[in-house]
């Protein structure tokens, strides 16, 4: 892929993840510009990635060849009209946010149509992400391939229909947060039961890998899997946990998708 300049409009968590991975997979960070309204955020990014250019001017990041829109939807909606004049005719804008469809993005960018949307998730930081991507009709095949190359180091990036991206935001992007605190609690309890850190982590990792493999094994239904362990200490709490999933995640999906 031809060496391109890369801009990040927004310097938050997801930008840090992208820089961490892309910098380790061959992207020349001295061709990267990160813009943000927070001096503290920019200082953190510059400290961790000294080669990048940081600025409070979003148009500087938007003037790059490949532009990642790394803002939450309300902030992106406010910022986009001011970026339209900075975009070059051959630029590509890659939105990392849910909610803002290609139609909305194009309208806010004055008709700019060279667009992609990605829903990234946190395991990308170790190259194990699941980052569904959709391409706007105005983005040619060569540029689509370039976007995919940029995403390669982050993990898997299946091309999906745009209308499914908000579902992936709930399932894959936010999914780790539904489990991480539970795993940490198990890790802490294991220590209180007398296991060392190495022993607890080895057992927890193996259990999670084995449980995942079992859950998705085509030879077992969910009922088969659930019946494999006779003692279920949290069975009394399952109804409340399931209802919390339905209430919280169902409501959030409706908000993101406008359903």
Which positions does each model-derived feature cover?
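NAD(P)+-binding Rossmann beta1-loop-alpha1 motif at the extreme N-terminus of oxidoreductases
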Residues: 1-56, 62, 128, 189-193, ...
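NAD(P)-dependent Rossmann-like dehydrogenase/reductase catalytic/cofactor-binding core
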Residues: 2, 191, 198-259
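A structural micro-motif
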Residues: 4, 30, 52, 91, ...
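Rossmann-like NAD(P)(H) cofactor-binding subdomain of soluble oxidoreductases
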Residues: 18-19, 39-40, 48-49, 59-130
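Short conserved AdoMet
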Residues: 27-28, 88, 110, 152
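Glycine-rich beta-alpha junction loops
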Residues: 38, 97-100, 120-124, 172, ...
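Internal alpha-helical scaffold of NAD(P)-dependent oxidoreductase catalytic cores
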Residues: 104-114, 130-167, 178-216
């Amino acid at each position: 892929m031809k060496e391109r300049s890369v801009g990040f409009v927004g310097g938050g968590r997801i930008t840090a993840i992208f820089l961490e991975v892309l910098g380790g997979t061959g992207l020349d960070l001295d061709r990267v510009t990160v813009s943000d309204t927070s001096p503290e955020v920019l200082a953190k990014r510059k400290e961790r990635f000294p080669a990048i250019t940081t600025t409070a001017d979003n148009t500087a990041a938007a003037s790059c060849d490949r532009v990642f829109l790394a803002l939450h939807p309300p902030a992106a909606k406010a910022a986009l009209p001011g970026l339209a004049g900075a975009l070059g005719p051959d630029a590509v804008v890659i939105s990392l946010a849910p909610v803002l469809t290609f139609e909305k993005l194009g309208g806010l960018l004055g008709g700019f149509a060279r667009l992609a949307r990605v829903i990234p998730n946190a395991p990308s930081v170790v190259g194990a992400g699941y980052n569904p991507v959709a391409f706007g009709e105005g983005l040619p095949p060569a540029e689509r391939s370039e976007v995919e190359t940029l995403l390669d180091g982050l993990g898997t990036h299946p091309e999906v229909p745009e209308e499914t991206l908000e579902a992936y935001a709930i399932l894959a992007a936010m999914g780790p947060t539904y489990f991480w605190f539970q795993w940490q609690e198990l890790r802490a309890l294991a220590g209180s039961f007398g296991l060392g850190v190495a022993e607890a982590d080895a057992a927890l990792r193996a259990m999670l890998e084995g449980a995942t493999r079992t859950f998705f094994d085509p030879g077992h239904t969910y009922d088969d899997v659930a019946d494999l362990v006779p003692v279920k200490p949290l069975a009394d709490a399952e109804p409340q946990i399931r209802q919390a999933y339905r209430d919280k995640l169902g409501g959030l999906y409706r908000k993101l998708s406008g359903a």
